[in-house]
C-alpha cells in the first residue's frame, strides 16, 4: 500500500510502498480517507533533536485522520464494516494504576501512533478497537480528520470553569486558536490570544476571539485596560512553549488564577516563581486527550454550533504531500488536509 514514511535519518518525508498491516484479535483495520499534518509531523520532517531521539527509521508517520472500518478483529464488539471513525493516537497499556483507575490519558506506558508505531499516512491503518471513535453523521470528514489536535485544544480549554471568566491564550497556532474558540463558545467573557504571527492572529479573529494581539506591536496591558479588565486574567491557556509568553502570562494573571499548559517550553526555562507563589496560581500540565470524555465533548461542541472551518486553510491530494508540508513549514497556514481518496 501507498504510505508516507520517514525512510532516512535526514530532513524529508518520502512516498513509499509498504505491506498492508495485519489485523489482530482486538484491532480494527481502517481505510484512510483524509489525514491532517500535525506540528509533530513537521518536527519529524525536519529531523530535529527530538525526532532523532524518538523516531525509529523507517517509520510510517501521521496520527490525525478519518477513515472507514474495513476489517474487524474476532474479539471486537461495537463496530461494523463501514463505520466512519477517527481514533485516539495514544495507545495505552491497560494495566498500570492510572489505566485501571480510568485515567488512561495518564498512562505511563503510552506509545504514539505515527511516533512509536506505524501511523496513518497510509492507505490503511490498524489500531486497537478501544482507541477508535465513531464519527457522527453530521460531522464532516475534514473536521473529523483534525479531532486529534482539536482534542488537545478541548482538553486544555475545559480544564477549568470558563463561564464568565477572562481567558488569555498564548500562542495562535491551530491548537491555540481552537482552544480560544472553545473558550468563547462555552461562555468565557473576554478571550484574548497573543502571538507575533499576523497570519495566525487573523485566523483567530475569524474564529471569534475578543482580541487577537500581536505582542510585537501592541501592549497586552493596554488591551486589558481597553477591555475594562482591572484585576487580570482568570484562566491562562499556554499553547506556545515560548518562555517570554509564559512570563507575560504570569504577570497578567489575577490572584488565584488557573493555568493549563500544553505548549512545551525549553527544559531550562526560568520564571519568577514568587509570582506563582504569592499570586496563589494553579498550574496544570496537559498531555493528549482524556479518553474518551474529551472525544465526546469534541463531537458535542461541533454539534452545538462551534464552527472550526476557518482553521482548515489548505487541502491537497496526498500525491501533493510536499506542498502540504511546505505550507505547514511556512507559518502561513492553519490546518493542512491531505486526501487519500
UniProtKB/Swiss-Prot annotation:
Specify which residues bind NAD(+) according to the UniProt entry for this protein: 175, 195, 200, 262-264, 286-287
Q: Which cofactors does this protein require?
A: Zn(2+)
**GO biological process assignments:** L-threonine catabolic process to glycine
Protein localization: Cytoplasm
- Active-site residues (renumbered): 40 (charge relay system), 43 (charge relay system)
Which keywords, in A-to-Z order, does the entry hold? Cytoplasm, Metal-binding, NAD, Oxidoreductase, Zinc
- Gene Ontology CC annotation, any one: cytoplasm
Q: Which Gene3D superfamilies match?
A: Medium-chain alcohol dehydrogenases, catalytic domain (3.90.180.10), NAD(P)-binding Rossmann-like Domain (3.40.50.720)
User: Entry's SMART domains?
Assistant: PKS_ER (SM00829)
What does the record note about the cofactor? Binds 2 Zn(2+) ions per subunit.
Q: Where is this site: Important for catalytic activity for the proton relay mechanism but does not participate directly in the coordination of zinc atom?
A: 148
Task: Give the EC number(s) listed in the UniProt record.
Answer: 1.1.1.103
Binding of Zn(2+) 2 occurs at 93, 96, 99, 107
- Show the catalytic activity: L-threonine + NAD(+) = (2S)-2-amino-3-oxobutanoate + NADH + H(+)
- Record keyword Cytoplasm present: yes
What are this entry's molecular-function GO terms?
Answer: L-threonine 3-dehydrogenase activity; zinc ion binding
Pathway in which the depicted protein is active: Amino-acid degradation; L-threonine degradation via oxydo-reductase pathway; glycine from L-threonine: step 1/2
First and last residue of the signal peptide: none
PROSITE patterns for the chain: ADH_ZINC (PS00059)
Q: Where does Zn(2+) 1 bind?
A: 38, 63-64
InterPro entries on file: ADH-like_C, ADH-like_N, ADH_Zn_CS, GroES-like_sf, L-Threonine_3-DHase, NAD(P)-bd_dom_sf, PKS_ER, Zn_alcohol_dh
The entry's family comment says:
Belongs to the zinc-containing alcohol dehydrogenase family.
Q: How is the subunit organization of this protein annotated in UniProt? A: Homotetramer.
Role description: Catalyzes the NAD(+)-dependent oxidation of L-threonine to 2-amino-3-ketobutyrate.
What protein name applies here? Answer: L-threonine 3-dehydrogenase
Amino acid at each position: 500500500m501507498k504510505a508516507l514514511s520517514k525512510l532516512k535519518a535526514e530532513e524529508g518525508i518520502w512516498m513509499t510502498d509498504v505491506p498492508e498491516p495485519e489485523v489482530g484479535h482486538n484491532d480494527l483495520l481502517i481505510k484512510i480517507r483524509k489525514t491532517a499534518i500535525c506540528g509533530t509531523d513537521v518536527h519529524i520532517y525536519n529531523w530535529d533533536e527530538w525526532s532523532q531521539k524518538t523516531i525509529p527509521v523507517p517509520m510510517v508517520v501521521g496520527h490525525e485522520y478519518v477513515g472507514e472500518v474495513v476489517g474487524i478483529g474476532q474479539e471486537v464488539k461495537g463496530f461494523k464494516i463501514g463505520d466512519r471513525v477517527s481514533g485516539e493516537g495514544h495507545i495505552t497499556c491497560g494495566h498500570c494504576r492510572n489505566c485501571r483507575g480510568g485515567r488512561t490519558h495518564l498512562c505511563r506506558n503510552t506509545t504514539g501512533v505515527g511516533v512509536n508505531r506505524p501511523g496513518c499516512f497510509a492507505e490503511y491503518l490498524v489500531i486497537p478497537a478501544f482507541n477508535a471513535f465513531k464519527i457522527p453523521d453530521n460531522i464532516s470528514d475534514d473536521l473529523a480528520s483534525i479531532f486529534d489536535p482539536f482534542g488537545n485544544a478541548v482538553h486544555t480549554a475545559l480544564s477549568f470553569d470558563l463561564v464568565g471568566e477572562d481567558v488569555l491564550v498564548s500562542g495562535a497556532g491551530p491548537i491555540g486558536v481552537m482552544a480560544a474558540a472553545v473558550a468563547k463558545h462555552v461562555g468565557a467573557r473576554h478571550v484574548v490570544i497573543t502571538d507575533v504571527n499576523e497570519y495566525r492572529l487573523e485566523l483567530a479573529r475569524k474564529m471569534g476571539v475578543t482580541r487577537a494581539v500581536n505582542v510585537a506591536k501592541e501592549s497586552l496591558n493596554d488591551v486589558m485596560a481597553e477591555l475594562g479588565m482591572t484585576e487580570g486574567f482568570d484562566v491562562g491557556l499556554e499553547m506556545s512553549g515560548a518562555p517570554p509568553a509564559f512570563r507575560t502570562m504570569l504577570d497578567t494573571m489575577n490572584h488565584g488564577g488557573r493555568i493549563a499548559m500544553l505548549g512545551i517550553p525549553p527544559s531550562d526555562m526560568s520564571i519568577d516563581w514568587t509570582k506563582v507563589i504569592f499570586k496563589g496560581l494553579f498550574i496544570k500540565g496537559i498531555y493528549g486527550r482524556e479518553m474518551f470524555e474529551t472525544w465526546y465533548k469534541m463531537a458535542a461542541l461541533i454539534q452545538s454550533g462551534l464552527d472550526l472551518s476557518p482553521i482548515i486553510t489548505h487541502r491537497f491530494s496526498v500525491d501533493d504531500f510536499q506542498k502540504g508540508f511546505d505550507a505547514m513549514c511556512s507559518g502561513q497556514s492553519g490546518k493542512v488536509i491531505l486526501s487519500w481518496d
